[in-house]
Amino acid sequence: MITITNRQGKHLSVVVEGLENAPAIIFSNSLGTDHGMWQPQVASLKQQFKVITYDTRGHGQSDVIADTTVQNLAEDVIDILDALDIEKAHFCGISMGGMTALWLGIYQPTRFYSITVANSAAKIWNEEGWNTRADAVIENGLADLVATTHTRWFSEQFDYQHDALAQRTIQSLATTPALGYAESCRALAQADLSTQIQQIQIPTLVIAGAFDPVTTVADGVFMQQQIQNSELAVIDASHLSNIEQPELFTQTLSQFIGSIQ
């Protein structure tokens, strides 16, 4: 694990694995998790790629940063690429990370071969809901969310209790700084890229979870219809589809990336 300093002078925790001179792929975690959620994908893809994972600001080992916007989340990715001297990469983000992917596709397309937008939406939930959740987390901590999160993250078909990565990911929510979580909630409250995503020209993969109650298949269909050079894959999973269906997720991503090079 290395630490890079972003343009705001704050620290981001980054992990680089795989082949030094291979094409780079960078993964961005969901709200309330950390870089470790990508373990199955890293294990598979590091045989042929330079694989970068990082803790989104306010999560894991990365600094909590006040007044965060989705633009800030995306600019952190550019700062990581710059620090690692990577001119261009594939990008895959899930949920909040998917919103980051969309922003990068709109405003920084020259830095990416492709974006993958997993279990996300051009607008996730609503402003009032996010701000209310942020206030509640600041006041009461994350314990209430931890107790119910499995109902949103995983489907009833998935035995999350006996899946080591699912348990570790739930634990990462329990250890996420409340202020970092709340800052991300407020960023998502303000984020709406619905009208801008038509501008995306680079190859885009949209992955939706058939049982996802948070970012629905309809959200995925909307993005696929708006983004010209895009395709949609629906996976039998809930919100964290890369953990619930790791092999299928990785295979879908690999085939998409393979079709570009």
Regions found by a protein language model. Give the residues of each.
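Conserved HGGG/HGGXW glycine-rich cap/lid loop of the alpha/beta-hydrolase fold
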Residues: 10-63
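Catalytic histidine-centered segment of alpha/beta-hydrolase-like enzymes
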Residues: 237-250
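Flexible "cap/lid" loop of the alpha/beta hydrolase fold
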Residues: 102-107, 112-144
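Acidic catalytic loop of the alpha/beta-hydrolase fold
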Residues: 210-215
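Short beta-strand/loop motif that positions the catalytic acidic residue
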Residues: 200, 206-208
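Active-site loop/oxyanion-hole signature of alpha/beta-hydrolase fold enzymes
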Residues: 36-43, 52-92, 251
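Conserved alpha/beta-hydrolase catalytic His-Asp/Glu region
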Residues: 125-128, 140-198
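Catalytic histidine neighborhood in serine/cysteine hydrolases
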Residues: 217-240
